[in-house]
Amino acid sequence: MGLRRTSWMHFSALCRRAPLSTAPAAREQPAAGPGAEPVCGPAETARPPVPAVDFGNTQEAYRSRRSWELARSLLVLSLCASPALLARHEQLLHLARKLLGQRLFNTLMKMTFYGQFVAGEDQESIRPLIQHNRAFGVGSILDYGVEEDLTPEEAERTEMESCSSALERDGCGVSKREKQFQAHRAFGDRRDGVTSARTYFYASEAKCDSHMETFLHCIEASGGASEDGFSAIKLTALGRPQFLLQFSDMLTKWRRFFHHVAAEQGKAGLAAVDTKLEVAALQESVVKMGIASRAEIEDWFTAETLGVSGTLDLLDWCSLIDSRTELSRHLVVPNMQTGRLEPLLSQFTEEEERQMTRMLQRMDVLAKKANQVGVRLMVDAEQTYFQPAISRLTLEMQRRFNVERPLIFNTFQCYLRDAYDNVILDVELARREGWCFGAKLVRGAYMAQVGYEDPINPTYEATSAVYHRCLDYVLEELKHNARAAVMVASHNEDTVRFTLRRMEELGLHPADRQVYFGQLLGMCDHISFPLGQAGFPVYKYVPYGPVMEVLPYLSRRALENSGVMKGAQRERQLLWQELKRRLCTRSLFHQPA
């Protein structure tokens, strides 16, 4: 079994047209900011005034819903708020299935939890709901919600095998990856603590191809449903998670080395985008550490790759991984904990290289299909130990496909401490290289899955502050760059109000379709539908699939309503208020129109 040192070529060749570099011409482009001219913005035309949005007007908020649907929502959300019920919900579901039989159990679920949170069993059966929501200004993001029914033990075993290299599994090598990028049994079942996302486990290359086909069907359906559709994918569905772990480890070490050298040059504590290293001093440090020879170093740092300023920032530094393909095969960096030099890139077998290539090809197929049918493709965020790789691979797709409009959207998890720095760096890179920035901002669904130095904010309030800070920065960018766009994926009413206020202050009109809103089906209709009816682009994540196969998804919906979604109590109050209003006005048989 031959071993190869993987090179960046495998990642870059399939994901982009040209090497990541920061040539002088690109650096001379003026950064967007106050006073800058909009980039390729739409012609100024008279636009209608933006209607006021009232989330407390239940008659308008729920005019798309029949009374029995409101009663179901009130019942389901109230049950989800019961800690005693939630603690035993799996046992209760099992008991109900045993007592009622499969057919009656399916009927009960469709009348309650399934009907609330899932659109239907297949793309044909969900079409009426999609068309109904669109008539009231709400689009759909299709999400095939089926998960494999694995026991915790099976999930743990599958994850441990798919996150380890052949050498590690055979006991022939010791992992050089840092702790957070190694496989740990304690986190083997990635479903634990995840409240709002479908989880994929690697089974085989054929299974990954099947996941790709499912994503392709969703992209095609979204393209046919509207002229401004969205679709979402997860990279863990497309290949072995081992590659994401190893790539994340490499990127993290490379970035950490940059900050180590910055500290040596007395520049610790500066914002990531403002930290600039003196190239001459950096060259001396690299030679002293034995990372490369002086001749190799001189070949690294040239005017062609870094400009003529004599300094380089974190974006320049990360670009060196791309442009130094041959040297990266032998690249080593010092382990800041042991002091020893270690290979930056891990060893792959020939079979592992083929699997990695197939993963990147699947990403490429999906991006091309989205581009072909005009659907925006959102790459969902996942666990922190996968996220550096996911973000970087998404960025490579953005370089290639976001040339004319923001087609590929990266996801930023604002519960992470470095979320704001990551947003700033990606916006700056898009400015330099001239592609369209696209982002989805979320608070985060993986807060319980850490186990090392805590990368998350300490409280929900701290996360909300970071979310608003990131959102405000992106909205400022949108004001000066008409080719950028953002999806505000939040159930938090205060966050949505904050967005609307800042849009008004910055002159961002909903007709420009730069700011999108997203919520889950069955949750926060009092936010989604008033926005849609007022002309704001808003979307529901619409899961679908057979009843029994989406039960894991439904379990997490129930858990989310109990804790994460703080607005559930207000939503129940509004539902009850509207039912009482209809009862008092004799309009219980209200028909949406």
From Swiss-Prot:
Names of the cofactor(s): FAD
Catalytic reaction(s) noted: L-proline + a quinone = (S)-1-pyrroline-5-carboxylate + a quinol + H(+)
Pathway the protein takes part in: Amino-acid degradation; L-proline degradation into L-glutamate; L-glutamate from L-proline: step 1/2
InterPro entries with a match to the protein in the record: FAD-linked_oxidoreductase-like, Proline_DH_dom, Proline_oxidase
Any GO CC annotation of this UniProt entry: mitochondrion
EC nos: 1.5.5.2
Enzyme class: oxidoreductase
Primary site of residence: mitochondrion
Family according to the record: Belongs to the proline oxidase family.
Residues bearing the modification N6-acetyllysine: 368, 479
Function according to Swiss-Prot or TrEMBL: Converts proline to delta-1-pyrroline-5-carboxylate.
GO biological process, one term: proline catabolic process to glutamate
Bridged cysteine pairs (disulfide): none
Sample GO molecular function, one term: proline dehydrogenase activity
Protein's recorded name: Proline dehydrogenase 1, mitochondrial
Location of this chain's protein in the cell: Mitochondrion matrix
Encoding gene, per UniProt annotation: PRODH
Keywords: Acetylation, FAD, Flavoprotein, Mitochondrion, Oxidoreductase, Proline metabolism, Transit peptide
